[in-house]
Structure formats: structure tokens, C-alpha cells
Amino acid sequence: MEQEVYTALTFVELTTVHYQHDDPFGLFNAYVTLIPIAIAIGVITLILFRRDVRTISIFLGLLFSECTNYVLKKSIKEHRPTMWKELRKQSYGMPSSHSQFMFFFAVLMTLFYLKKRIRFGSKILPIISVTFLFFLAAGVAYSRVHLYYHTAKQVFCGSFIGICLGFIWYGVIEYIFRPYLFPIIINHPIGKYFYLRDSSEIEDLLNFEYTNVMNKVKTINKTKPIKTK
């Protein structure tokens, strides 16, 4: 007769979302609450393919926000709501890291647009983009309360801290990194080896890249020898 062996299991809290099976909006909010992970993956992808130092600084800002949240949680030690007893054992809830992440990112992107560090081809598109970012941030914040991962107070504090850190990190990028650190990085042999660049001064980056690529393609096509049968 085989002996049954039971092993205690745990989970990766970052990607695991619990919700009540009879909640009609539970699955939707579970997906909404994962938006910060999608944004982080998107930023990393941009870094790998664009090699822009400002994008790298945005990612560093997200790490700065997360580290700040970790320190605050360990210092405050306020538990999550009592709905899920197992979640209370995993980590603390004050402040909400998801809410902090989203509002940090939304504020930072908005400030970049207002300073014209991010340019769009139309006037209405940036307004829609900024509004959509804050809509997502509010949606993520609500999902944390709806899924009983945080209290309303924890979400509010996380959102407020994210907004404050967004302003602070924008100042770090604009007044320290961009004038002093970025030129050193992009002109350093290591920076050149990895093709690091700063494209923040280009008026319309999308149009600039499109025009240059198309001109290069035309030049290549003109120099190609004509094949004859």
C-alpha cells in the first residue's frame, strides 16, 4: 500500500490573483489588477529594442517606487483585509503597491507630455492617452479593493504616494539625469557598444524614424543592380 505524502504549497504573489467564484466581476477585476505587470513588461521590451536612456530611467523609477513601497510595508506592518486569511500571512497591505505603481507611471507620463518630452502627431491623442492612463490607474486601484487585497485606505495611500514619487522622479530625470548623466552614458564606450541613445530632443520621433527608414530604403533600392533575365 502506497503511503500518501502531503506537501505544503505556496505561490508567487506577484502573478497570482484570487477572487470569489460567484463574483460576476471577479475575473474581470483579476485581469485588471495584472495591468502593472503588463506595463513593466512593455517598458522592458522598449528598453531592449529602442535602447533609449530615458526609457531606462522610467524603468529605474518603477523599481524605485517598488523599493519604497516594500520599505513602507515592512515599516508600517498593516495587515490586508480580513477576507483572505492566507493573504494576511503572505505580506502587508499598507500602502498598496499596485495603486502606487499605476499612479506613479501615470503622473510620470503626463509630466513628460506636458514638458513635450513625449510628442504625438495630433492634439487630441495625448489627451486621450493621458486620460486612459489615469482611467487604468483608477481601475487597478478599485480592483485591489474589490478583490479584498487592500482596504480603501491602503489604496488611497498607495495612490497618493505614487503621485508624489512620480513628481519627484520626474525632477530627478529632468534636472539630474538628462543634463548630466545621459550625455556621459551615451558617449561612454559601453553606452556606444549597446547603442544607447537619448531621443528626447527629437520633435516627432515616430515621423523621424519613419522618414529616415524610408529614405534609406529608397537609397538602397536605387543602388541595387537591375536584374536581367
From Swiss-Prot:
Cellular component terms per the entry's GO annotation: endoplasmic reticulum membrane
Bilayer-crossing regions: 27-47, 94-114, 120-140, 156-176
Gene Ontology BP annotations: protein N-linked glycosylation
EC number(s) recorded for this UniProt protein: 3.6.1.43
Disulfide pairings: none
Pathway where this protein functions: Protein modification; protein glycosylation
Main location: endoplasmic reticulum
Subcellular location: Endoplasmic reticulum membrane
Membrane topology annotation: Multi-pass membrane protein
InterPro entries per record: Dolichyldiphosphatase_PAP2 (IPR039667), P_Acid_Pase_2/haloperoxi_sf (IPR036938), P_Acid_Pase_2/haloperoxidase (IPR000326)
Keywords carried by this UniProt record: Endoplasmic reticulum, Hydrolase, Membrane, Transmembrane, Transmembrane helix
Pfam families reported in the protein's UniProt record: PAP2
Top-level taxon of the source organism: Eukaryota
Reactions the enzyme catalyzes: a di-trans,poly-cis-dolichyl diphosphate + H2O = a di-trans,poly-cis-dolichyl phosphate + phosphate + H(+)
GO MF: dolichyldiphosphatase activity
Family label: Belongs to the dolichyldiphosphatase family.
Function statement: Required for efficient N-glycosylation. Necessary for maintaining optimal levels of dolichol-linked oligosaccharides. Hydrolyzes dolichyl pyrophosphate at a very high rate and dolichyl monophosphate at a much lower rate. Does not act on phosphatidate.
The protein's name: Dolichyldiphosphatase 1
Species of provenance: Dictyostelium discoideum (Social amoeba)
